[in-house]
Amino acid sequence: MTDANLVLGRIRADAFLGGGMSLDIASAESALDTLASKLQMSRLQLAEGIIELAEQQMVKALHAISIQKGHNPNDFTLCCFGGAGGLHVCSLAEKLNMKSAIIPQNSGVLSAYGMLKAQKQRQFTKTHIIQLDDISHHQLEQLFEGLESQGTKELKLEQVGRQTIRSERSLDLRYQGQSFTLNIPFSADQTRNIADLFHHSHQQHYGHQLTNTAVELVNVCLSLTIETQQSNDVICTEVQNDATTQVIQLPSIEKEVTILQREAIKEGETIIGPAIILEKVSTTWLKEGWCAKIDQFQHLVLKKHEVIVQ
């Protein structure tokens, strides 16, 4: 993938990791040429094919968390992360018919940053298979209290005060006879309509509901989270150089592409694609037909727009 993006000019060999690592484009071209000759295609065709295959796999993963769960991707904004996320976000959004995307600040190290900032959490589950109509509110409370007691004891070993722990309750439910469950949030004021919430969730996920079939409780679930004070840290702010332009070759065409540092983009300034937006921990390939702005949170907001053919 890196070789393919490098050969297509979407990654600058001299700007990888903010210039801290130089990529060998000649070796990348040689590797692609070897395979391209066996497949009887050009180097650029192979590079585009590699990226297309990879993006199709990414689309499958996005389908699994959207369409397959009853959500229309077009109703959402695509958020990407990772060093290569910005290289593919425009194409992925187009494949999902999405009109906007967000590349968070420090997106290239977002996972690592998230691990450092994430709140400590414990998940507890107790299996208790019974028809929902046959268990009382008092019995559910007893089950949750048992899990909360167990969880609190574990968290106290980390010297956490009870007042800093947030509790979230939920139930794994299914229609009687099913082998899979849906997790439904639970609170005291939901005890009378929990079955209705399950029917609605089943409708959203699978397109139908079985209101005449008994709803069965399978698991009682508890999530305990240690509340911690969050801060807005800035990881990478160094500007490498001013905006420049260069001509990069895409399959069968040449386009003048703006190359600039993300940190040099002013809040509210509009960048029109095609453009390459560089930063120390990632690269963004802004395709033709897309524009980008930095918002008040220093996130890069991408929007799809109509291309005027001259």
State where each predicted segment sits.
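C-terminal, non-catalytic interaction/recognition modules in large multi-subunit enzymes and RNPs
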Residues: 1-73, 80, 85-310
